[in-house]
Amino acid sequence: MDETENLMPREKMLQYGIEALTDVELLALFLRVGTRRQDVLSYAQALLQRFGSLYALLSADKAQLIAVDGLGLAKYAQLKGIAELARRYFSSQLVEEAALVSPSTTREFLQSQLTEEEREIFMVIFLDNQNRVLKHSRLFSGTLSHVEVHPREIVREAIKVNAAAVILAHNHPSGSPEPSQADRLITERVVKCCRFMEIRVLDHLVIGRGAYVSFAERGWI
């Protein structure tokens, strides 16, 4: 028998490190207590089985969560707090990085910002000539399946902060991150407009449910 099996999540974490915890144990660590019928580990396991994953659980809305037996407003607040803490962590990490040396940092930040949006949002990260983040903005918002993007507005914002480069991103609320022909055409327009002002477009990421597509990785930029 694995000697870690009889340890509670907190003790296991302190002895073996946070990475040793399973998803069930990590969730139980935050929930702290279970219900009248289930201990915290059994309850955490039941929640993950019901929703299918940590992502689905933390993305669920209030009605979906409080419909679960034993999950009242207190636990709802805990779960939403965990999700918001993660989102703010990635946001602060992006801003405080000396430079964007890791594409995964950018991707994780954008996923934390856009995955749960119910309509299309177009974001831009503005960078200096050393790839340090100057600012990030949600410049355009649209409908469930479309967002109108104005390349000149992107350039105008870039000039305001003296940006040397930008990273584009938008989400697909439908779940599939596969870029449409319209996505490719607007990206080409933004690239041309930025190039005229000597601003580099490093990438355009399309964010779906648990997946993404990078224009740079596909060789489209």
UniProtKB/Swiss-Prot annotation:
It comes from the Bacteria. Residues 99-221 form the MPN domain. Disulfide bonds: none annotated. Pfam families: RadC, UPF0758_N. GO terms for biological process: proteolysis. This is UPF0758 protein KPK_0116. It comes from Klebsiella pneumoniae (strain 342). The keyword Repressor does not apply. InterPro entries: MPN (IPR037518), RadC_JAB (IPR025657), RuvA_2-like (IPR010994), UPF0758 (IPR001405), UPF0758_CS (IPR020891), UPF0758_N (IPR046778), UPF0758_YicR (IPR022820). Zn(2+) binds at H170, H172, D183. A motif (JAMM motif) lies at residues 170-183. One of its GO terms (molecular function) is metal ion binding. Keywords: Hydrolase, Metal-binding, Metalloprotease, Protease, Zinc. Belongs to the UPF0758 family. YicR subfamily.
